[in-house]
Amino acid sequence: MISCLAAQFFTGWKTENKELAENGEAALSIGQYVHSGHFIQATFENWESEFLQMMLYVLLTVSLRQKGSSESKSLDKEEDVDKEPVPHADAPWPVKKGGIWLKIYKHSLSLAFALLFLISFSMHFYGSLKEYNEEQISKEKPTMSASQYITESRFWFESFQNWQSEFLAVASLVILSIWLREKGSPESKPVDMPHHETP
């Protein structure tokens, strides 16, 4: 992950400086680029879609089923993840504590992804607005406020193009795992399991 982020940063910095040079503007230093709208927007736009995907995946797999998919819970029997938690010596402290702490902890995974999505969405919006206004200033055109930019098609295009690709990837895994196998992978059914069976 760190190597990919570093590669994104370096290539993004080079790309941005190339575009600035073509427009007759001064190049950005590494320190300037890390605070630029170009880097912030590109980074958090992708993180936003990943956290949205994981949040929805966690929530939807609670109740939705797909016959034959390795990603689905069983269609006809209760699984361990559906059972009510029982306090014991090695249980996480919210389970031992009970009450509101246990209620929150029962949904802490989806809540964490929701929080990460909201932070990433906000940072994507901030970076996209900053990049847009930087471009407008360089062209000596009017800038936008946050309340104006939230309705701008450019921002939503950036989000939706990533969201749809994440949903496509998840749907592909759920559907393809009905018929295809990968020996040794926990994402696959056993190689000899019939297509109609759900593990």
Describe the predicted segments one by one.
Residues 5, 12, 32-65, 70, ...:
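A structural feature that tracks compact, well-ordered secondary-structure segments
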Residues 22-33, 79-80, 139-148, 152, ...:
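Short, motif-level signal for alpha-helix interfacial/capping segments enriched in acidic residues
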Residues 1-2, 55, 99-117:
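Alpha-helical transmembrane segments and their helix-start/interface "positive-inside/aromatic belt" motifs
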Residues 1-16, 23, 89, 116:
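Charged/polar interaction segments and conserved charged motifs
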Residues 88-102:
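Cytosolic juxtamembrane amphipathic/interface segments immediately preceding
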Residues 10-26, 128-141:
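Interfacial/capping segments of alpha-helical transmembrane domains
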Residues 62-85, 177-199:
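Cytoplasmic juxtamembrane regions at transmembrane-helix boundaries
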Residues 35-38, 88, 107, 124, ...:
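Histidine (H) residue identity feature
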